[in-house]
Amino acid sequence: MNVSRKPVSIVSFNSNLGLIEPAPGKEPGVKKLPEWLRKFGFFDLVDHQEEIGLEPPPYSMYLDPVSDMRNTDSIAAYAKQQALIIQDVISRKHFALVLGGDCSIIIGNALALKQLGDYRLFFIDGHTDFMWPSLSSTHGVAGMDLAIVTGYGHDKLSNIHQLAPYFKEQNVWCVGNREYDISYIAAIENTAIHYYDLKTLRQSGIPGSISSFFASLASGPADGFWVHLDVDVLDPLIMPAVDSPDPGGLSYPELNMMLESLLSHPQCTGLEITILDPDRDPDGKIVREFILEAGAAIQRSLAKE
């Protein structure tokens, strides 16, 4: 068995508070992801030293009238607890392998990183997640998370402990979006975020986008970087178990190339995996393929010296 470059802590932040109900009275199934991954062998595949879990607040559809976002106070409280755990993991020189949950879990992880120093973000997602309540039809935080962690939106989430922004715009790479509606992408295009939609990513080449990210690490002070992976970046033909599938998307070879390049870099601090919904994968076929493909790429990367 290979010895990991850093000890790995598997951290379960299985909050579903950032999503709306998939059907009346039914809460999103992403809360079950860590145990679904365990059942089908992910925890056995990835060499790790410890497992940590943080139970999220109860699910609701509550729309906070102050922030105009759902479950704002519960997400903020959970984020503060997350931050304490991630700070401890990273301070002990462990790699944080975080399992969601929905994309709102990035808020607590980002808060921890801001408290620890100056970190970059490589954001792999089938959507930009860059909007605010006036642009959102659902008011779910999981569709606004990248905007929140770069300082946009209500202070309840974007400015916890008066630390906004958790990531500077120019230190963020957002790759893989395939929602091309002009009204949707206008928000992110008016920022300093390095934005590669799926078409641009393929035209410029995956190695090119990653090389530019690594060059930014070398050009200025950085304490490390974090990787966000929303599995809806994958083609729904291979990853249909998500709440917002769109045609097209990355193949596993494309995703694995990114993961292996990023996670094997010595400044990579952690990876979060979000949105895979076991309720949409009743026989486990989809998660088994994810573990066989992306899980194996993660293990190879973390085991490199």
For each feature predicted by the language model, list its residue ranges.
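Conserved alpha-helical scaffold segments that buttress catalytic/binding sites
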Residues: 2-305
